[in-house]
Amino acid sequence: MDSIFSNTQERPRSLHHLSEVLQIPLLDLRLSCVYCKKELTSLELYRFACIELKLVYRNNWPYAVCRVCLLFYSKVRKYRYYKYSVYGATLESITKKQLSDLSIRCYRCQCPLTPEEKQLHCEHKRRFHYIAYAWTGSCLQCWRHTSRQATESTV
């Protein structure tokens, strides 16, 4: 793969594109985590592709991120780069865009929020967070996870 990806302009940025370029089925790709260097499982590869994360390159070699490192470094990112939080209506007035037109990812698992998840933030008066120059919120799965943790810690 070295010679294929030495030109930075031609590097595939998504797993789907990498799969096409190499003519290898997506789940047969063998990629390592950029942080811990462990090989990603098929499930981790599939999830990486589904949540539309981008590949990174080190020495002309593509890397992804495993689930454990993704959750860990998302938490680090939140603590290091959190700026402020706003409600949905405020976010729309700040950006002068509808929530449906904004690209918002989950601050915990990094999956893109669906229009329904964005609407839930407004209905339940949950805030969106500005972290590392990007708007984030909670996907439904992480919303349940964080709500369950809060409930368990108060019991």
Curated annotation (Swiss-Prot):
One of its GO terms (biological process) is symbiont-mediated suppression of host innate immune response. SUPFAM superfamilies: E6 C-terminal domain-like. A zinc finger (unnamed) spans 33-69, 106-142. Pfam families: E6. GO terms for cellular component: host cell cytoplasm; host cell nucleus. It comes from the Viruses. It is found in: Host cytoplasm; Host nucleus. GO terms for molecular function: DNA binding; zinc ion binding. The keyword Zinc-finger applies. Keywords: Activator, DNA-binding, Early protein, Host cytoplasm, Host nucleus, Host-virus interaction, Inhibition of host innate immune response by virus, Metal-binding, Modulation of host cell apoptosis by virus, Transcription, Transcription regulation, Viral immunoevasion, Zinc, Zinc-finger. Plays a major role in the induction and maintenance of cellular transformation. E6 associates with host UBE3A/E6-AP ubiquitin-protein ligase and modulates its activity. Sequesters tumor suppressor TP53 in the host cytoplasm and modulates its activity by interacting with host EP300 that results in the reduction of TP53 acetylation and activation. In turn, apoptosis induced by DNA damage is inhibited. E6 also protects host keratinocytes from apoptosis by mediating the degradation of host BAK1. May also inhibit host immune response. HAMAP family: HPV_E6 (MF_04006). Forms homodimers. Interacts with ubiquitin-protein ligase UBE3A/E6-AP; this interaction stimulates UBE3A ubiquitin activity. Interacts with host TP53 and EP300; this interaction inhibits TP53 activity. Belongs to the papillomaviridae E6 protein family. This is Protein E6. It comes from Human papillomavirus 66.
